[in-house]
Amino acid sequence: MYTLVLLRHGQSLWNLENKFTGWIDVDLSDQGKEEAKNAGKAMLEAGITPKAAFTSYLRRAINTLNIALDTMNLHYIDVFKSWRLNERHYGALQGLNKKEMVKIHGEEQVNIWRRNYDVPPPPLPKDDPNHPCNDPRYKHIRCQDLPSSESLKDTLERTLPYFQDFIAPTLFQRGCVLVAAHGNSLRAIVKYIEDLSKDEIVKLNIPTGIPLVYVVDDNLNIKSKRYLADEETLKKAIESVANQTKA
């Protein structure tokens, strides 16, 4: 059996301000740093010892991973970073407050942008300084391969090859891996290993800073699944994500 741990980054500064973040590289809030530390403690208490870890190119995920590993005294394990684990790109919505967008466009339209499976938000122009084509961390990637906006479907198509080609083989080789990433890139992995439908995945909310632990067999069949949190804490965290566009 193999242990796969998925960890959505702790609360970011823009989570706190309820803004669309996407590929904008904001850091963790103080609460987010505490969530990352608590995630490390929860894994320690559960006897989970990752042998390798994966994260995105964005500091809120990287710092969540670093804090969690440091808490576990596992700062020395191999860490692999990939842009394919980045959050969904929210295009021209990045930096805008979700509730303000509801006032302008209506809750239905904003929820379509947030939650519809295959409808991307308005794109970010390629000459915008925040476009990934203009960011040196992506200079090794062809501009045409970098997103200006993404639907959840687009995010899945970006993330899954990396999971299949790198994360899963490392899991089978080392026995236990930790993936610290983002709500939508993690939803891509969850959809794949749980074989969820489009309707099921758009309704799934992954809370910040709470490890989701799968035990799987050689074929990624799930033998057990659990969040490392008590029921009340988990419920509040999931509701917090679900209510981001509600007045």
UniProtKB/Swiss-Prot annotation:
Positions that bind substrate: 8-15, 21-22, 60, 87-90, 98, 114-115, 183-184
UniProt-listed Pfam families: His_Phos_1
Residues of the active site: 9 (tele-phosphohistidine intermediate), 87 (proton donor/acceptor)
Coiled coil: none
Keywords: Gluconeogenesis, Glycolysis, Isomerase
Major enzyme class: isomerase
Record's catalysed reaction(s): (2R)-2-phosphoglycerate = (2R)-3-phosphoglycerate
InterPro entries: His_Pase_superF_clade-1, His_PPase_superfam, PG/BPGM_mutase_AS, Phosphogly_mut1
Xref: SMART domains: PGAM
Signal sequence region: none
PROSITE patterns xrefs: PG_MUTASE
Highest taxon of source: Bacteria
EC code: 5.4.2.11
Keyword Isomerase on entry: yes
Pathway: Carbohydrate degradation; glycolysis; pyruvate from D-glyceraldehyde 3-phosphate: step 3/5
Keyword RNA-binding annotated: no
Record GO terms (molecular function): phosphoglycerate mutase activity
Record SUPFAM superfamilies: Phosphoglycerate mutase-like
A biological-process GO annotation: glycolytic process
Function field: Catalyzes the interconversion of 2-phosphoglycerate and 3-phosphoglycerate.
Family: Belongs to the phosphoglycerate mutase family. BPG-dependent PGAM subfamily.
Record protein name field: 2,3-bisphosphoglycerate-dependent phosphoglycerate mutase
Underlying gene: gpmA
